[in-house]
């Protein structure tokens, strides 16, 4: 590029006294690629006035160049570098109303050209400078890169003073000349006029300054007088400031004395409160109170009330608002020493409560009650209620003693309820077999007319049906009695022992201190209250779960299918709203869990009995009893679960039982002691299972019904293929060997007759062994064999015989096809045709 620059400088610019400052090789101009080389040159004139110009130079033949377009720097409006963050050779120049899109040879050429153009614009065109956008502008250097020629000294002065005027300055200058009725050519006359006006103005200014000398002197005198006044004012301000300082100190002293008086008043008030509180505490407990505690009679309600008042007075003395230093006073110590009688009172109270708990429990056991009812404890509660306030006082002042009393109550009451539950559940369990026996008697006639086709120990037979009326009544009795007893005991325990009193007090204190009781705090308090109540109630009724479990086992032991009815009853009740704070909800939940376990165990037992098939040696299996047992189970379950909510558990049980039945069929078919063919056992039982499921119409078992049908058809095909070759045994063996020989040796079918063992003579010999009479005789034996393998009066006999016919006809056709393929032109045929075979099958079927 430097060589081209020198050539262009010498050919084009040197003769015009111009110097190239920057040059860029233009690859594309306005999106068009130039055939000849095009250059964009930035040049300045050497002599003054200096002018900056842009040239488009076009390359010609023979390495010559020609100036094509010329533009002055004033005409350039905008230079756009496109993207300052990305090196790109493209940039735009707007000259006049036209925008040139230029693609330089490289990004470096573009940057150097725009940088030089910016420097020249700043130096020679600062007012009408073009807009440079999307380009990192360089910092201007103190020296310029233009090196003009040496000029005379006066020319240098002209160069340094030269500043181009702006358009506004030019317009203002023309207005001034026009106002003087002059032209640009008469500028020297205008300059002389301005000089004369300037001289007249200077003279006027001097005369004005001379005339205003007296005024200036007067002004200075006024300023001096003002300064003197300011000094006097400052002295007065200093005097006032001293007075204010004295007042400020006096006020601070007064405030200090006032604060001390406030402290003194507060101290006197607090001292008065302390003394009043101390005196009230001392006066709270009198000698009569102490005497009342010493002579307490807990059997007398009036004495109990007096003891309660005395105990509250002692609590007021102990918990009064007395500061620690006041506790060291002799009056307090003396009164506190006199309260040793409280310890004796507490011991007597604990002894009385222990004896009272035991006596009341014995009294509750001695009362006669209905056999299916749990005795109510209202009398025991009324006897203990007067002591509730003393228990509350004991809980606040003697928590360890209160815990011992609570534990004694739990131990004694636990024994009471254990005995009551023993009697109640023993009577209840004895009612269960009576209910079943009465049901057996009422349905004896009905059960005699029903054939189950199952073992005699099936507890799902109609002779052992559950009592759908008595058993729900027993469950209702259990729940009603337990609910009444548990709720009454819970209310009494909470009220008598004040279980939640400290939590309520703590919650009230927290709410008062915070000014707000949030719902989160309320839920937390309720949770703690329920935990405490459940802990106490759980210890009181720890034997209840054992009795409930025994009751469920007894009901299921007399008839395991009772668990279905229990499950349905409890499933309906579990949807009813329950009080979460009641301990009975926990008991109810435990009963639901126990019944669900019994339900799962019952289904598991049924599955094991369905899948484990016991077969005597050398016996024909026939239809398994598990299928009839499964059908009876489904029928009974559908009656029990009618309109029930928990169908999901029942459908899951159906699925497991049906799978167990299928497992039993597979095990029975594979049993080594069975005389029945494996495929016969499978398709007969799968057929029976399919009929059973079709009759029951259980939607969740629809897929199992389809699978049973598919398995039946699969094993019928296997059975038919197994016994198919018996009427034509030698022919089947012959052609099986032919097919194997062709496949293993790879010879052509029409060449098989050349083998000695497969010659035409051998084929005729084999065919002659199966005349029509022999084939019919073999088919009759096959029919008898099938009839013997199937159960008596089986509906599948004709189905199997029809499949056997179709398979036999296909076999005959296949043999004829092999004869035509392997023995072409031999005219050898089987002695029985397809029509003859069909006639044989029809005659045999009609005979039987």
Curated annotation (Swiss-Prot):
Family statement drawn from the similarity comment of this UniProt entry: Belongs to the SEC3 family.
GO biological process, one term: exocytosis
Organism annotation: Caenorhabditis elegans
Pfam families, sorted: Sec3-PIP2_bind, Sec3_C-term, Sec3_CC
Protein's job: Component of the exocyst complex involved in the docking of exocytic vesicles with fusion sites on the plasma membrane.
Gene: sec-3
Subunit comment: The exocyst complex is composed of sec-3/exoc1, sec-5/exoc2, sec-6/exoc3, sec-8/exoc4, sec-10/exoc5, sec-15/exoc6, exo-70/exoc7 and exo-84/exoc8.
Protein's recorded name: Exocyst complex component 1
MF annotations from Gene Ontology: phosphatidylinositol-4,5-bisphosphate binding
């Amino acid at each position: 590029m430097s060589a081209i620059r020198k050539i262009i400088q010498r050919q084009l610019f040197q003769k015009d006294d111009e110097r190239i400052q920057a040059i860029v090789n233009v690859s594309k101009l306005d999106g068009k690629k130039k055939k000849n080389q095009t250059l964009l040159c930035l040049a300045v004139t050497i002599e003054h006035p200096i002018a900056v110009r842009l040239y488009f130079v076009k390359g010609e033949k023979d390495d010559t160049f020609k100036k094509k377009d010329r533009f002055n720097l004033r005409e350039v409006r905008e230079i756009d570098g496109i993207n300052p963050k990305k090196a790109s050779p493209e940039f735009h120049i707007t000259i006049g109303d036209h925008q040139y899109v230029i693609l330089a040879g490289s990004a470096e050429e573009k940057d150097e050209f725009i940088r030089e153009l910016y420097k020249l614009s700043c130096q020679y065109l600062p007012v009408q400078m073009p807009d440079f956008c999307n380009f990192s502008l360089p910092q201007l250097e103190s020296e310029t890169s233009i090196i003009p020629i040496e000029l005379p000294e006066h020319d240098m002065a002209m160069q340094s003073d030269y500043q181009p005027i702006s358009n506004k300055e030019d317009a203002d200058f023309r207005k001034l000349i026009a106002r003087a009725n002059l032209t640009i050519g008469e500028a020297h006359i205008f300059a002389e006029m301005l000089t004369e006006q300037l001289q007249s103005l200077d003279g006027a200014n001097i005369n004005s300054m001379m005339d205003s000398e007296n005024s200036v002197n007067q002004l200075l005198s006024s300023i001096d007088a003002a300064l003197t006044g300011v000094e006097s004012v400052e002295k007065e301000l200093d005097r006032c400031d001293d007075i204010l300082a004295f007042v400020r100190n006096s006020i601070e002293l007064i405030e200090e004395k006032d604060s001390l008086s406030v402290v003194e008043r507060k101290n006197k008030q607090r001292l008065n409160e302390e003394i009043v509180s101390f005196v009230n505490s001392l006066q709270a407990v009198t000698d009569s109170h102490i005497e009342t505690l010493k002579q307490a009679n807990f059997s007398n309600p009036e004495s109990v009330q007096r003891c309660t008042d005395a105990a509250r007075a002692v609590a007021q003395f102990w918990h009064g608002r007395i500061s620690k230093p006041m506790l060291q006073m002799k009056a307090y110590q003396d009164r506190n020493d006199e309260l040793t009688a409280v310890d004796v009172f507490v011991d007597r109270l604990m002894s009385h409560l222990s004896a009272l708990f035991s006596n009341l429990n014995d009294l509750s056991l001695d009362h006669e009650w209905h056999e299916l009812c749990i005795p109510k404890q209202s009398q025991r509660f009324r006897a203990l209620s007067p002591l509730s306030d003393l228990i509350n006082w004991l809980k606040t002042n003697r928590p360890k003693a209160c815990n011992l009393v609570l534990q004694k109550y739990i131990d004694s009451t636990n024994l009471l309820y254990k005995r009551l539950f023993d009697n109640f559940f023993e009577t209840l369990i004895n009612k269960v077999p009576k209910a079943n026996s009465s049901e057996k008697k009422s349905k004896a006639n009905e059960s005699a007319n029903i054939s189950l086709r199952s073992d005699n120990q099936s507890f799902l037979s109609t002779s052992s049906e559950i009592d759908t009326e008595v058993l729900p009544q027993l469950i209702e009795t259990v729940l009603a009695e337990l609910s009444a007893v548990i709720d009454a005991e819970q209310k009494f325990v909470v009220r008598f022992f004040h279980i939640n009193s400290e939590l309520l007090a703590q919650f009230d204190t927290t709410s008062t201190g915070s000014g707000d009781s949030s719902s989160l705090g309320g839920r937390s308090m309720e949770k703690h209250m329920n935990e405490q109540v459940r802990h106490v109630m759980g210890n009181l009724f720890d034997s209840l779960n054992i009795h409930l479990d025994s009751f469920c086992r007894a009901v299921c032991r007399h008839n395991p299918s009772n668990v279905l009815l229990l499950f349905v009853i409890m499933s309906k009740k579990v949807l009813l709203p329950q009080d979460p704070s009641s301990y009975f909800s926990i008991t109810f939940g435990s009963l639901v869990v126990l019944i669900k376990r019994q339900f799962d165990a019952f289904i598991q037992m049924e599955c094991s009995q369905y899948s484990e098939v016991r077969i005597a040696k050398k016996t024909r299996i026939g239809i398994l009893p598990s299928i009839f047992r499964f059908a009876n189970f489904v029928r009974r379950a559908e009656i029990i679960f009618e309109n029930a909510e928990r169908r999901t558990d029942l459908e899951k049980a159906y699925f497991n039982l049906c799978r167990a039945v299928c497992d039993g069929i597979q095990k029975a078919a594979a049993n080594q002691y069975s005389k029945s063919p494996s495929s016969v056992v499978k398709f007969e039982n799968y057929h029976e299972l399919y009929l059973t499921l079709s009759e029951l119409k259980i939607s969740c078992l629809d897929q199992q019904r389809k699978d049973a049908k598919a398995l039946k058809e699969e094993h019928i095909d296997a059975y038919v293929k197994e016994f198919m070759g018996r009427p034509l045994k030698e022919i089947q063996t012959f052609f099986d060997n032919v097919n194997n020989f062709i496949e293993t040796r790879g010879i052509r079918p029409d060449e098989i007759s050349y083998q000695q063992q497969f010659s035409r003579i051998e084929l005729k010999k084999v065919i002659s062994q199966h005349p029509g009479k022999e084939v019919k005789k073999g088919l009759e034996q096959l029919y008898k064999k099938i009839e013997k393998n199937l159960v008596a009066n089986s509906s599948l006999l004709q189905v199997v015989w029809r499949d056997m016919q179709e398979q036999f006809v296909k076999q005959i056709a296949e043999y004829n096809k092999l004869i035509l393929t392997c023995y072409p032109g031999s005219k050898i045929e089987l002695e029985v045709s397809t029509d003859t075979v069909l006639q044989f099958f029809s005659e045999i079927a009609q005979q039987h």
